[in-house]
């Protein structure tokens, strides 16, 4: 079963209008297997009042909300651990990305790069191992169940988190770079039911075997970017706008104990 539909991807193409400070951030899906590519997703997040799709007509949100803009995706050459680390640091400094807004895949050999980044750039650099369990957080504030109650493994949480940000317009993808490969990967990724009511996204290996195409590195890189914002952005996305609390006037009840005693015996 598909997770992300073509309509969701089509509706995500556009540019957000920020109305306050923006934070630059980046996520790297590192190359582990022969045909894998090192893919970087670079973006910004902040408070927005609307967005402009490809038709050029600005669309205002009902209420300003904190959103993520994917500005670009780029491939990096595969290098040895320290050389790869140096390239990531060079890029982060050039784009003024703080250590706490940088995320890398630390699966397998990626662990060495993540450790080197923590040592050379900052201990706040986030690392995600695709074999880890899903987190105990809610993807959306409306969710009644935590991620670890719905998804088998963090890799599943990553893709479903991305899907929800697309569906409820917390993520927009800039039309300024070629997105055909990203769209193909996003709409082709499948999942299946697993035991105990959990769902599991197919692995990269299974995806490649089924589709006979390249590894979905662009999709995974973007899913890491959304995860980074979710975990460190300090704002929880919601499906619906929170209803304002109604003020209910309560008339003060006067009990018998509040009356003074009057002696009528005389």
Show where each model-derived region lies.
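RNase H-like, metal-dependent nuclease domains and their acidic two-metal-ion catalytic environment used
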Residues: 1-131, 137-140, 144-145, 152, ...
């Amino acid at each position: 079963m598909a997770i992300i539909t073509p309509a969701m991807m089509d509706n995500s193409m556009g540019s957000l209008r920020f109305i306050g400070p923006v934070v630059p951030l980046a996520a790297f899906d590192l190359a582990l297997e022969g045909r894998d590519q090192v893919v970087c997703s670079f973006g910004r997040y902040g408070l927005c009042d609307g967005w402009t799709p490809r038709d050029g007509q600005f669309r205002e949100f009902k209420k300003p909300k904190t959103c993520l803009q994917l500005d670009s995706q780029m491939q990096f050459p595969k290098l040895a651990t320290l050389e790869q680390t140096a390239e990531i640091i060079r890029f982060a400094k050039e784009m003024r990305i703080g250590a706490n807004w940088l995320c890398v895949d630390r699966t397998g050999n990626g662990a060495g790069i993540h450790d080197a980044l923590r040592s050379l750039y900052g201990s706040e650099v986030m690392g995600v191992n695709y074999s880890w369990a899903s987190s105990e957080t809610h993807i959306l504030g409306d969710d009644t169940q935590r991620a670890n109650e719905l998804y088998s493994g963090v890799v599943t949480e990553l893709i479903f988190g991305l899907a929800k940000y697309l569906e409820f317009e917390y993520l927009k993808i800039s039309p300024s770079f070629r997105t055909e490969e990203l769209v193909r990967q996003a709409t082709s990724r499948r999942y299946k039911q697993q035991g105990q009511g959990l769902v599991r996204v197919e692995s990269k290996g299974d995806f490649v075997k089924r589709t006979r195409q390249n590894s979905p590195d662009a999709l995974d890189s973007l899913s890491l970017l959304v995860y980074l914002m979710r975990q460190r952005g300090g704002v929880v996305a919601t499906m619906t706008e929170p209803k304002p609390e109604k003020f209910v006037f309560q008339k003060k009840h006067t009990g018998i104990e509040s009356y003074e005693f009057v002696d009528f015996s005389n």
